[in-house]
């Protein structure tokens, strides 16, 4: 009787041990099944259709090797009371694991397979902007140029943005929105978005960078003048550290009634985008309210009629926080990107002759 009782106890103990081992093994397997399939970081595009059941979602994830086991995925969903998985197109990786995948499915997809990323560099003009947009969207070059000069559109912008003023009504401006579109990388919903949609994004970004200067004491200048100056500084200065000093040079010359003498404004006036092309004497003398190289006195003490390129935050800050000095001239070594500043013309001319061979063609 005692032997039978002992035998029963041993059997029961064995059963309990086996159950414990089974539970532990199951838990280990379950936890392992929830882990990442591999260490791969390659994106996989999957589509969860509207109305898909949890089982169908599990099958889709397994098909793309994003989960190890459909059953454990379903168990995880049940145990965690998940019932709000969202449909859509997702980018997922094999190294995510079930928890991250479920979190993503609960949050919903932010991935758009039709999304277009478009980049506008600092210091480019409206013609170059038009080329970039026409190459990356369904809009034509002409669509962009026309929108940049659209009077009705400009009227709407005046109501929306404090920095869009009546100065843009000037018919002599090549492109009314030149210099007002902030250079950056933008994400577009698709290639079919309108030029106005793109411009609105760029203008909203410009507003962010100008906001701190909304109540600036402009004295006898306006925001349009500061943007014109900033675009000159953007194009003239190889490095940002020289820009506030360079801005002061132009304003010093303006205060003395001199022409501002900026080569980049002459290049813009002639609509020459080839940076390797040296300007001729005739091009430097082109009669234009953009050309600050004119020697006939018509541009003495005057900024160009408007901005000549996109403008970085560095150049914006430089003109609003210009240095205080007496320099009237500067010249840069194109190769080393070092800029030299002078108070008198003879010293400037000496350095210019010294750098003539280095800067040939610029």
Regions found by a protein language model. Give the residues of each.
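Signal peptide-directed extracytoplasmic domains
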Residues: 30-206
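A broad, low-specificity signal for short, low-complexity segments enriched in glycine/proline
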Residues: 6-10, 49-54, 277, 288-291, ...
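Bacterial extracytoplasmic/cell-wall-associated proteins, especially those involved in peptidoglycan
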Residues: 134-142, 153-362
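Short N-terminal secondary-structure initiator segments
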Residues: 19-24, 41-56, 120-126, 158, ...
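N-terminal type II signal-anchor transmembrane helix
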Residues: 3-41
């Amino acid at each position: 009787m005692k032997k039978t009782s002992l035998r029963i106890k041993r059997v029961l103990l064995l059963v309990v041990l086996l159950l414990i081992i089974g539970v532990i093994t199951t838990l280990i397997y379950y936890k392992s099944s929830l882990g990442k399939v591999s260490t791969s970081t390659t994106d996989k595009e999957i589509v969860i259709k509207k109305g898909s059941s949890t089982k169908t979602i599990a099958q889709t994830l397994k098909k793309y090797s994003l989960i190890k086991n459909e059953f454990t995925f379903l168990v995880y969903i049940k145990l965690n009371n998940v019932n709000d998985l969202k449909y859509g197109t997702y980018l997922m990786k094999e190294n995510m694991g079930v928890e991250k995948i479920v979190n993503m499915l609960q949050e919903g997809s932010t991935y758009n397979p039709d999304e277009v990323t478009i980049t506008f560099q600092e210091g480019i003009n409206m013609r170059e902007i038009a080329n970039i947009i026409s190459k990356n969207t369904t809009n034509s070059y002409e669509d962009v140029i026309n929108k940049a000069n659209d009077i009705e559109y400009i009227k709407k912008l005046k109501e929306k943005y404090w920095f869009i003023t009546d100065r843009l009504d000037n018919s002599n401006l090549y492109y009314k929105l030149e210099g007002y579109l902030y250079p950056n990388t933008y994400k577009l919903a698709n290639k079919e978005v309108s030029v106005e949609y793109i411009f609105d994004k760029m203008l909203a970004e410009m507003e962010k960078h100008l906001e701190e200067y909304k109540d600036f004491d402009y004295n006898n200048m306006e925001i349009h003048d500061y943007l014109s100056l900033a675009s000159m500084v953007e194009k003239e200065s190889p490095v940002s550290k020289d820009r506030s000093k360079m801005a002061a040079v132009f304003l010093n010359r303006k205060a003395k009634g001199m022409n501002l003498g900026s080569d980049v404004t002459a290049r813009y006036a002639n609509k020459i985008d080839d940076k390797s092309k040296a300007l001729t004497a005739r091009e430097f003398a082109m009669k234009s309210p953009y050309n600050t190289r004119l020697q006939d006195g018509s541009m003495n003490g005057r900024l160009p009629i408007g901005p000549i390129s996109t403008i970085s935050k560095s150049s914006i800050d430089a003109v609003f926080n210009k240095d205080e000095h007496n320099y009237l001239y500067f010249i840069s070594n194109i190769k080393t990107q070092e800029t030299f500043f002078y108070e008198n013309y003879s010293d400037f001319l000496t350095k210019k002759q010294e750098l003539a061979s280095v800067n040939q063609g610029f």
